[in-house]
Swiss-Prot record:
Catalytic class of the enzyme: oxidoreductase
Enzyme Commission (EC) number: 1.7.1.13
Catalysed transformations (reactions): 7-aminomethyl-7-carbaguanine + 2 NADP(+) = 7-cyano-7-deazaguanine + 2 NADPH + 3 H(+)
Descriptive protein name: NADPH-dependent 7-cyano-7-deazaguanine reductase
Length: 166
């Protein structure tokens, strides 16, 4: 019979339920929090749809807006969603190219969780008539997840989208 989490399992979760939040406008990977995956014997995806991502162009300082999709197959740890929200918010004044932001996010989440598999896909709104949609992924080396990452990378965008995909 399934039961809820015990208090000692939640002691490292400090942001969820906390009404006294600090919204950092500068990149803060240390705000990320994790909790234990209680279903380690099962492969399953966790997907976050993050439609309000903002960062800055490193050259012009102009804001860039995106929807970010983060999908992962957890191992031992999972990312806590409120900490992820605050972490993504911390990119608000971070100046970097779209591709860099997606790789930074993926690397920080790998460091936090050590997932079996993870992918991060940014769908940025057009600037100058061009939208940029960087996709990055990772599968644990020497495992089926590494092969999965290779396959998904090669096939991630087989169906080109229409211009009205935003």
């Amino acid at each position: 019979m399934a039961h809820g989490r015990q208090q000692d399992e939640l002691q490292d979760i400090t942001l969820l339920g906390n009404q006294d939040n600090t919204y950092n406008f500068d990149y803060r990977p240390d705000v990320l929090e994790s909790f234990d995956n209680k279903h380690q014997g099962r492969d399953y995806f966790v997907k976050f749809n993050c439609p309000e991502f903002t960062s800055l162009c490193p050259i012009t300082g102009q804001p860039d807006f995106a929807t970010i999709y983060i999908s992962y197959i957890p191992n031992v740890k999972m990312v806590e969603s409120k900490s992820l929200k605050l972490y993504l918010f911390s990119f608000r004044n971070h100046g970097d190219f779209h591709e860099d932001c997606m790789n930074i996010i993926m690397n920080d989440l790998i460091e936090l969780m050590d997932p079996h598999y993870i992918e991060v896909w940014g769908k940025f709104t057009p600037r100058g008539g061009i939208s940029i949609d960087p996709y990055t992924n990772y599968g644990r080396p020497n495992s089926k997840y590494e092969q999965m990452a290779e396959h998904r990378l090669m096939n991630h965008d087989l169906y080109p989208e229409k211009i009205d995909n935003r």
